[in-house]
Regions:
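Residue-level marker for buried hydrophobic side chains located in beta-strands
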Residues: 32-34, 63, 86, 167-169, ...
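Short, acidic/turn-prone active-site loops that include or flank metal/cofactor-
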Residues: 15, 91-93, 173-174
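Active-site HxH/HxHxD metal-binding segment of metal-dependent hydrolases
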Residues: 40-42, 50-131, 234
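C-terminal regulatory/interaction regions
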Residues: 236-239
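Short glycine-/acidic-enriched loop or helix-start segments at secondary-structure transitions
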Residues: 19, 43-45, 73-75, 97-98, ...
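Conserved beta-strand hairpin/beta-sheet module of binuclear metal-dependent hydrolase folds
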Residues: 1-52, 159-171
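Short Pro/Gly-enriched beta-strand edge/turn motifs at strand-loop
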Residues: 3-12, 116-121, 140-142
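Metallo-beta-lactamase
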Residues: 38-40, 123-124, 128, 138-140, ...
Length: 239
């Protein structure tokens, strides 16, 4: 579905019925992908590109919000199929290019055994990162995309502020399924840092917010984030 005239959101559903992350197609004289979903999604994503009237070679860039496998599972295949340049934050790049192994979640042993049958789905293939993105960088796409370093879920998590569209894409800084929430603590390296990143986000100017998981909020999104930031801060203080 189109969130704005130039930003398309594709759900992360696989044929198995299990959910991965949302994928975003930014349309501006070609296509920029934001995240790539679980492994095995590349054909579906390229079909979306074609359905919107573009060729695989029209995909110039792939921006990675963070290194988790439900966001980069199809990255290597899509990079090879399109020739796109991959961009990510320096703190997450070593996990994307295979310099460092993907860290497992902070989970009890029994949960690891429960998830082990899904290991092939959650696996990743290393992909070269062509450009490192730092806080405050601006990309010449859709009138200028501002890179926000929003760590917490991972050390190198980023969000994308697109003033022209009055939109911010936040990866897994927040999720929105029935209500706004933080991502699961089992898969978050620093919850306290994540709260700080949410407060940082609440101080910016946007009207629409799109998430790695869940439906976008398409009106008064900044106010919703500010309210949520106040709520979690109050909870942390025990009020």
């Amino acid at each position: 579905m189109f969130i704005t005239k130039n930003v398309y959101q594709s759900s992360g559903m696989r044929s198995t019925g299990l959910w991965g992350a949302n994928i975003f197609l930014l349309i501006d004289n070609g296509v920029t992908l934001v995240d790539t979903g679980l492994r095995g999604r590349s054909a579906n994503i390229l079909n979306e590109v074609k359905r919107l009237g573009y060729k695989p070679s029209d995909v110039a860039y792939i921006i990675v919000t963070h290194h988790h496998s439900d966001h980069i599972g199809s990255l290597a295949e899509l990079k090879n199929a399109t020739g796109a340049k991959v961009m990510a934050h320096p703190a997450d790049a070593p996990y994307i290019d295979g310099t460092l192994p993907q860290p497992g979640p902070a989970r009890p042993r029994w949960l690891g055994k429960l998830l082990s049958p899904l290991s092939s789905m959650w696996s990743t293939v290393p992909a070269e990162v062509d450009k490192l993105l730092n806080d405050g960088d601006e990309l010449p796409i859709l009138g200028g995309i501002k890179i926000l370093h929003t760590p917490g879920h991972t050390p190198g998590s980023i969000s994308l502020l697109i003033p022209q569209e009055k939109l911010v894409i936040v990866g897994d800084l927040l999720a929105h399924r029935f209500r706004m929430r933080m991502p699961p603590g089992l898969f978050t390296v620093d919850v306290e840092q994540g709260v700080k990143s949410i407060k940082k986000l609440a101080g910016l100017d946007f009207n629409i917010i799109a998430f790695g998981h869940g439906a976008p909020i398409v009106n008064e999104a900044r106010e919703a984030v500010a309210h949520f930031a106040d709520k979690i801060e109050s909870k942390a203080k025990g009020r």
